[in-house]
């Protein structure tokens, strides 16, 4: 049984999602402005190497992700057709960022001190925002009808894509096997928690999402487009 949403419900969802995206952008700006690259008022309990990575992440958040969130949220409230393409680019990133920063940037070692735990609800909001917008944005894309891809071109794309994904996976798996054999790489010694958070997220979520996107191009091309955007939105950011 197909249920038709009322105009009031549709309007409510548009405004709610738009405000969630805008608030997510504001939170990212707050975290970035107070992070180690700018004001340095947030102290993460992690290694110097990880702090250097956070500085780069702060710049990305300020000049790429936050503008995407603002533009996507505002354009969705204003009922612009481009909004769905902007909304679907950021959900995976928001969840990934919230989890890696919330969990991975604190290591219970006396060598590191900080106060990042005070930002728990900031990171939680970003994770929930990513989950909600991912589920919502997928519904914005309707099946495109009969889509045909040139089999030769699709095969070339699939091979290149899968090889790239497998090479990326092998890099993480190699380090996982090193840890399993008690031959710890430098990245593990600096922050074991962050090491596992990133590998679990990549090997358990983003890499399978990429492989699934290729599979859908072959089996369900009419509905594969939003999954492509989910993956490439994360890959781009």
Describe the residue ranges of each PLM region:
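Short, Lys/Arg-rich, polar N-terminal cytosolic tail immediately upstream
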Residues: 1-13
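An N-terminus-focused feature that recognizes amino-terminal "leader" regions
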Residues: 10-17, 21-63, 69, 75
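Alpha-helical transmembrane segments of multi-pass integral membrane proteins
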Residues: 20-32, 91-99, 122-141, 152-177, ...
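Membrane-interface interhelical loops and short amphipathic "cap" helices
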Residues: 36-52, 104-121, 178-192
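A loop-to-helix transmembrane entry motif
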Residues: 53-59, 188-208
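Alpha-helical transmembrane segments in multipass membrane proteins, preferentially the mid-helix core
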Residues: 68-74, 133-142, 204-222
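Membrane-interface helix-loop-helix junctions at boundaries between adjacent transmembrane segments
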Residues: 72-132
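Central hydrophobic cores of alpha-helical transmembrane segments
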Residues: 86-94, 226-236
């Amino acid at each position: 049984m197909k249920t038709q949403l009322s105009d009031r419900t549709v309007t409510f969802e548009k405004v709610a999602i738009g405000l969630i995206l805008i608030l997510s952008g504001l939170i990212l700006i707050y975290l970035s402005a107070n992070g180690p690259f700018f004001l340095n008022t947030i102290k993460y309990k992690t290694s110097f190497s990880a702090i250097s990575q956070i500085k780069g992440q702060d710049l990305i958040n300020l000049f790429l992700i936050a503008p995407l969130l603002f533009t996507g949220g505002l354009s969705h409230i204003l009922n612009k057709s481009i909004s769905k393409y902007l909304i679907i680019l950021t959900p995976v990133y928001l969840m990934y960022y919230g989890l890696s920063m919330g969990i991975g940037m604190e290591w219970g070692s006396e060598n590191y001190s900080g106060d990042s735990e005070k930002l728990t609800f900031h990171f939680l909001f970003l994770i929930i925002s990513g989950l909600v917008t991912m589920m919502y944005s997928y519904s914005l894309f309707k099946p495109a009808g009969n889509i045909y891809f040139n089999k030769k071109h699709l095969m070339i794309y699939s091979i290149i894509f899968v090889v790239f994904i497998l090479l990326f996976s092998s890099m993480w798996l190699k380090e996982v096997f090193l840890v399993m054999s008690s031959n710890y790489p430098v990245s593990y010694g600096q922050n074991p928690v962050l090491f596992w958070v990133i590998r679990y997220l990549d090997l358990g979520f983003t890499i399978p999402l990429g492989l699934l996107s290729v599979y859908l191009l072959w089996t369900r091309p009419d509905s594969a487009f939003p999954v492509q955007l989910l993956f490439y939105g994360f890959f781009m950011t």
